[in-house]
């Protein structure tokens, strides 16, 4: 679309989590809109390497930078913003697998919530014009840790936008990682003093950065929320296919749960479009058509595989759809 082309063309774009299923498609579509520079930031080197090779083959003149690092690392993130000065940030880095996050809730909070805060903080400090958070429909009245963490991410983004509009970045809390450079030469007894000194100096530098960027309109923070994307990492369909190939069971958390689905290119195209419309503070909800019951989806996938269904009660109160394969019920021992 012309409006997306004009929005992206000639700008420096940062995509965190750029090697993931959503992040890599963002990079593909952004690369086709002639950015001044595209920066891919990801902690997983194999994913980052794969998308780098693909883009370099397809877009010979693309100014592409691929960086390895974590959004949980304040100093690394700050260095990226300080060196490359991205104008638009797409924040796709996140832990997305619901069952894994139930077992490791602290990691979900650290990577999703704290990682979002640190990246948004750097974007505001260094004068990025727009920050787009990739969120999920699981953030609506969340029933799991991952969904709750993404809802907190949305709240962080809306708070950041309010701070940006007020020009009061100095009121933002400083995290421990913003201070640790002052601890390197301190003995343990001096750490409290060092931390207090750093808080004062950091707030002073933040105020100076805010004054420097007064001529800008401030960073606009928005979130884009969508449902399950077909074929993406963490999506339920690849999981169901693997469970079916293994002979079952196919597990559904609850028979009444519904989800929305669209393809990865469709979802990313709408994310880019939402970014062009943003004024700051919005949570865009993509129109993904009619909701689909996960239970019905699982049953239809089993039927498409020419298998029969047996339904029973599984572990952890999950509704387990078992497959009748070669006249024997395939079940978990």
Regions found by a protein language model. Give the residues of each.
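Hydrophobic/aromatic anchor residues within beta-strands of the central parallel beta-sheet
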Residues: 66, 108, 221-224
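N-terminal Rossmann/SDR dinucleotide-binding element
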Residues: 1-85, 187, 195-198, 203-207, ...
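Short mixed-charge
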Residues: 162-192, 197-198, 202, 206-217, ...
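A conserved pocket-lining segment of Rossmann-fold NAD(P)-dependent short-chain dehydrogenase/reductase
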Residues: 101, 216-228, 239-262, 266, ...
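Conserved residues in the N-terminal Rossmann fold of short-chain dehydrogenase/reductase
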Residues: 67-68, 110, 254
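Conserved mid-core alpha-helix of short-chain dehydrogenase/reductase
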Residues: 76, 118-122, 261
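Conserved Rossmann-fold NAD(P)-dependent oxidoreductase catalytic core, especially the SDR/UDP-sugar
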Residues: 85, 91, 95-154, 158-161, ...
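Mid/C-terminal beta-alpha module of Rossmann-like enzyme folds, strongest
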Residues: 277-333
